[in-house]
Design a protein with these regions (language model features):
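Extracytoplasmic gate region of multi-pass secondary transporters
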Residues: 33-34, 209-251, 255-261
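Helix-breaking motifs and short loop linkers at transmembrane-helix boundaries and internal kinks
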Residues: 45, 77, 98-103, 132, ...
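Conserved MFS/SLC helix-loop-helix module at the cytosolic interface between two early adjacent transmembrane helices
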Residues: 64-103
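Helix-to-loop junctions at the C-terminal end of transmembrane segments
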Residues: 65-77, 260-273
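Cytoplasmic helix-loop-helix junction between adjacent transmembrane helices
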Residues: 108-144
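Intracellular juxtamembrane helix-capping segments at the cytosolic ends
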Residues: 118-131, 313-327
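Helix-loop-helix hairpin linking two adjacent transmembrane segments in secondary transporters
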Residues: 133-134, 140-189
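A late C-terminal transmembrane helix in Major Facilitator Superfamily
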Residues: 329-364, 371
Length: 420
């Protein structure tokens, strides 16, 4: 396979398969922890504050790592960065094989978080570059696979514990990472252009109010994800549910994330104005978190699926919306990296705040209320995401301003084409 293959149909197919394989590996290391919280605590005597670090630290490191990725892209190729990311994910998961201390478990979470950071800093720009007419579709596939992997982590790991030690069960998630690494090495070639220096002036993106609006929205979405991944299973296990039953709840949430993460971007692809679909995603989260707060025992699967559908749809949509703001793939990728970097650092506070509220009030109701407050703020911010104003708010030169009709035709093409 030569260097031009990433621009040919076969190269597109290989890259799309890589997107799927990588996406499936980005969340099991997080979602597998919650259902095993009691077993981990029994062996290692970790309190809730320490358990929170298994979610908080990876999210924070994902934020730091994504911010560093644009600088790394100037020094090395996207293919090398993805290879390093998969190595970090694999080593981090394998380290859990004989976890005898909380420090080792936290170190493994840190490595996995850094690997996830590199992926999420590199892939959005690659997707916009190689699938320019199918960005909503391919971003939806990536997000859906990421959330589907989370569902597998939450549902399969407690079942594996029936015949394996919990640390061995966690370490098994290094095997699918190895499969993705083998596919990258043997089948995927990316042109050096994917890693060329970014254009002058991108450093000013961080000074734009629009960048910070996207950061806050992204942070609120992923704060909700961090809270449910860390504490949904323990909340129900505190009421007598088994680890397997609580893991099934997280799996239902992640399955709804998967469907919505793929479906909502496809529904939104017919128009550059994606606000009504984001509004639907926020409404589902409000209903889901409201149910967890007011009537957690009445319909837990429904509440979890509403939360999952809202989280999955809003995550995919905000990723697409960030890429919509700028026509150049490299600048759009840098904006996405800024949004994810600072957004994940903001999101990392969610699990910690939830643990603090639990200590303060004795249950998780206040954690769900906290997320509801964030969603109300986000619903106001989303109103400002009018695509007619993207060129102005991003400070594009007059000659570079994209027309709405051009964007709409590109989005419509995403609907009329199947993935390469």
């Amino acid at each position: 396979m030569n260097q031009r293959n990433a621009d040919q149909p076969a190269g597109h197919t290989a890259l799309l398969v890589l997107v799927i394989l990588i996406g499936l590996n980005l969340r099991p290391f997080l979602t597998a922890i919650g259902p095993l919280a009691q077993a981990i605590d029994q062996r290692l005597a970790l309190g809730m504050d320490t358990l929170a670090w298994l979610t908080l630290l990876p999210l924070w490191l994902i934020g730091i790592g994504v911010l560093l990725t644009p600088s790394l892209r100037r020094r090395t190729s996207a293919r090398q960065l993805l290879g390093l990311a998969l190595l970090l994910l694999g080593i981090g998961s394998a380290m859990r094989f004989d976890a005898q201390s909380g420090a080792l478990l936290i170190a493994s979470a840190a490595l996995c978080g850094l690997g996830s950071a590199l992926v999420q800093g590199v892939l959005p720009a690659l997707i916009k570059q190689h699938f320019a007419r199918k960005v909503p579709l391919v971003m939806g596939i990536f997000s859906a696979c990421m959330m589907g992997g989370g569902a597998l982590g939450a549902s399969l790991t407690p079942r594996l514990v029936a015949s394996l030690d919990w640390s061995r069960a966690l370490a098994l998630w290094s095997l699918p990472v190895l499969l993705a690494l083998v596919w990258l090495v043997w089948q995927v070639r990316l042109p050096r252009a994917a890693a060329v220096a970014i254009l002058h002036g991108e450093q000013r993106l961080i000074t734009l109010p629009r960048s910070w609006l996207l950061i806050v929205c992204f942070g609120i979405i992923n704060s909700g994800y961090g809270i449910v991944v860390a504490w949904l299973a323990p909340a129900y296990m505190a009421n007598g549910w088994s680890a397997a039953q609580a893991g099934e709840l997280v799996a239902w949430l992640a399955l709804a994330q998967t469907a919505s993460g793929l479906g909502l971007p496809l529904l939104a692809a017919r128009s550059l104005d994606r606000r009504r679909w984001m509004g639907l995603a926020i409404a589902m989260q409000l209903a889901g978190f409201g149910g967890l707060w007011l009537a957690p025992a009445s319909a837990p699967i429904l509440w979890c699926m509403l939360c999952g559908a809202g989280l999955g749809g809003s995550f995919s949509l905000i990723m697409v919306i960030a890429l919509d703001h700028l026509p150049d793939p490299r600048r759009a990728g840098t904006l996405s990296a800024l949004m994810q970097g600072f957004g994940f650092m903001l999101a990392a506070t969610g699990p910690w705040v939830a643990a603090w509220l639990y200590h303060l009030f004795g249950d998780f109701a206040a954690a769900w209320q906290w997320q509801l407050g964030g969603l109300l703020l986000m619903s106001l911010l989303v109103l400002r995401l009018d695509p007619r104003h993207y060129p102005r708010v991003m400070g594009l030169p007059t000659a570079s301003k994209p027309t709405l009709s051009a964007h709409l035709s590109t989005s419509a093409a995403a609907q009329s084409n199947t993935p390469a």
